[in-house]
């Protein structure tokens, strides 16, 4: 094998590894975005129910607290994007 073939094979392997890393990061960010949307939706729903009935819905509050406990990040901080 010539040196050019070896360099080409190494370049393909490096490109494959980089592609896997990039798509993994994209997937993690996508999941985080979906979780944030669900949390925002639950917060809006709790606010609407609180306005309608004068108190918060216990089921929604429990679901929101469960979601927040799953991820230790501060979801309301949008400055890091």
Swiss-Prot record:
Pfam families registered for this protein in UniProt: Vpu
Task of the protein: Enhances virion budding by targeting host CD4 and Tetherin/BST2 to proteasome degradation. Degradation of CD4 prevents any unwanted premature interactions between viral Env and its host receptor CD4 in the endoplasmic reticulum. Degradation of antiretroviral protein Tetherin/BST2 is important for virion budding, as BST2 tethers new viral particles to the host cell membrane. Mechanistically, Vpu bridges either CD4 or BST2 to BTRC, a substrate recognition subunit of the Skp1/Cullin/F-box protein E3 ubiquitin ligase, induces their ubiquitination and subsequent proteasomal degradation.
Alphabetized Gene3D superfamilies for the sequence: HIV-1 VPU cytoplasmic domain
Membrane topology per record: Single-pass type I membrane protein
Description of how the protein assembles with itself and partners: Homopentamer. Interacts with host CD4 and BRTC; these interactions induce proteasomal degradation of CD4. Interacts with host BST2; this interaction leads to the degradation of host BST2. Interacts with host FBXW11. Interacts with host AP1M1; this interaction plays a role in the mistrafficking and subsequent degradation of host BST2. Interacts with host RANBP2; this interaction allows Vpu to down-regulate host BLM sumoylation.
Keywords tagged on the record: AIDS, Apoptosis, Host membrane, Host-virus interaction, Inhibition of host innate immune response by virus, Inhibition of host tetherin by virus, Ion channel, Ion transport, Membrane, Phosphoprotein, Transmembrane, Transmembrane helix, Transport, Viral immunoevasion
Sequence similarity: Belongs to the HIV-1 VPU protein family.
Activation and inhibition: Ion channel activity is inhibited by hexamethylene amiloride in vitro.
Modified residues annotated as Phosphoserine in this record: 53, 57
Gene Ontology CC, one term: membrane
Start and end residues of each stretch annotated as Disordered: 50-81
Localization per Swiss-Prot or TrEMBL: Host membrane
Keyword Phosphoprotein: yes
Extracellular side: 1-7
Other information: HIV-1 lineages are divided in three main groups, M (for Major), O (for Outlier), and N (for New, or Non-M, Non-O). The vast majority of strains found worldwide belong to the group M. Group O seems to be endemic to and largely confined to Cameroon and neighboring countries in West Central Africa, where these viruses represent a small minority of HIV-1 strains. The group N is represented by a limited number of isolates from Cameroonian persons. The group M is further subdivided in 9 clades or subtypes (A to D, F to H, J and K).
Topology feature Cytoplasmic, residues: 29-81
UniProt feature, compositional bias: Acidic residues: 53-63
Stretches that traverse the bilayer: 8-28
A GO term for molecular function: CD4 receptor binding
Protein name in UniProt: Protein Vpu
Post-translational modification: Phosphorylated by host CK2. This phosphorylation is necessary for interaction with human BTRC and degradation of CD4.
Chief location category: host cell
BP GO annotations: receptor catabolic process; symbiont-mediated suppression of host innate immune response; symbiont-mediated suppression of host type I interferon-mediated signaling pathway; symbiont-mediated-mediated suppression of host tetherin activity; viral release from host cell
Classification lineage: Viruses, Riboviria, Pararnavirae, Artverviricota, Revtraviricetes
Domains (record comment): The N-terminus and transmembrane domains are required for self-oligomerization and proper virion budding, whereas the cytoplasmic domain is required for CD4 degradation. The cytoplasmic domain is composed of 2 amphipathic alpha helix that form a U-shape.
